[in-house]
């Protein structure tokens, strides 16, 4: 159950950080969106790894 709560916390943090950045920079700097999307992919990959580790610990 804790891993589910942690997952939602990670998603909420990502949304809180990424969405304003996209809204703020999309009009002035289109190339910034590519960088933001790349960092979002990296963040989601890290979050996925963390969740897999937590589930593996829970299974033991």
Swiss-Prot record:
Keywords: Antimicrobial, Secreted, Signal, Toxin
BP GO annotations: venom-mediated paralysis in another organism
Compartments, record wording: Secreted
Tissue specificity annotation: Expressed by the venom gland.
Maturation propeptide residues: 25-34
Signal as UniProt keyword: yes
Chief place where the protein resides: secreted
GO cellular component, one term: extracellular region
GO molecular-function terms, A-Z: toxin activity
UniProt signal peptide: 1-24
Role summary: Induces paralysis 5 minutes after injection into blowflies (L.caesar), and then death within 24 hours. May have antimicrobial properties, like most ant linear peptides.
Similarity comment: Belongs to the formicidae venom precursor-01 superfamily.
Protein name (Swiss-Prot/TrEMBL): U20-myrmicitoxin-Mri1a
Organism: Manica rubida (European giant red ant)
Lineage: Eukaryota, Metazoa, Ecdysozoa, Arthropoda, Hexapoda
